[in-house]
Amino acid sequence: MLGRISAIRKATIGLALCATAAVGLAACGTSSTTASGPSCPNTTSLSGAGSTFINPLMSKWSEQYVDAHCGAQVSYQSVGSGAGITQFLQQTVDFGATDSPMTDAQIAQSKAGAVLHIPATIGGVAISYNVPEVAASTHLQFTGDTLAKIFLGQIKNWNDPAIAASNTGVNLPNQPITVVHRSDGSGTTGILTHYLAAVSTAWSSGPGAGTTINWPTGVGAKGNDGVATQVKNTKYAIGYNELAYVIANNISYGAVQNKDASGFIVPSSDTVAAAANSVTDIPADLRFFFVNAPGANSYPIAGFTWMLVYQNQTDADKGQAIANFAWWATHSGQQYASPNYVSLPANIVAKDEAQIKSMKCGSSACYKG
């Protein structure tokens, strides 16, 4: 499935919900070919848009969910977090997905009331690169300061002393670095730039952090798949991608120095989980980053993808369908996170449950489970 990333820019998710007034959604045990059969007479169509970061997992969810449920259809557009937030606020979709939480200013634009952030998965942002002289089995090592200087355009060649200092014995060519960054509003960019701002005063006082920034150098590409393609096809390029994209496209990726500078950590489900499990201070609205997390084995560039939903739903059928899909995704759906994403920690799942249970369909709770 991950090998199909570039072909699933727009994933159609056949979700299924047995429509009964008493229970909202009940499993039918039917396959996708019988999801609209006699036992499931009603159909609720939902639409979502946003994060490319989560798209490989969302596609996997679609396959599994349609096999176990029946009745509703959900389409998901992998357009980037920024575009997803825009569509969500314009109410042209029923839910959004973003890797950077909405800002206070964005939430203030909501014409449909309170917005809920529901963490759906956790992933790592890998530093992708294309340096032919470096063996594919080698993960080049980068400090946070070195990465900031590369993306600032201050380190210009691959054999720069700052890179060489962390990669003793590696054949680093005297070739110019081509930085590849996102051209669209991107939650993946949000995670990376929050990390760079945390480790570099030059970055925090310069480009800063956000889904869209003024990049000091480099070329832009749209979506995680666009950056992956650009890096793969450009010798001596460096970029950043959700881990699933570099693995699916056989792109080399680096190890990043951990917070206490005791080692260089390769992104994986284990090292991203270590970062996520180090989080103890969780705000009530679940809007936070955990970049540069403590822990010897914590990969420092990791973050959530959130589902965005409105707390007060005006269409009871859609509200129930959204709530039930969100519940499934944050519970049964977590088993499909491995190997390139991380299952949500129990403390986050508990907070997700409270968010979903707070959704109202008129005077009743949307979630009936």
Question: Where are the regions that the model predicts?
Answer:
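Flexible loop/hinge segments at secondary-structure junctions
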Residues: 2-6, 11, 29-369
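Sec-dependent N-terminal signal peptides
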Residues: 9-19
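C-terminal motif of bacterial Sec signal peptides marking the signal peptidase cleavage site
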Residues: 22-27
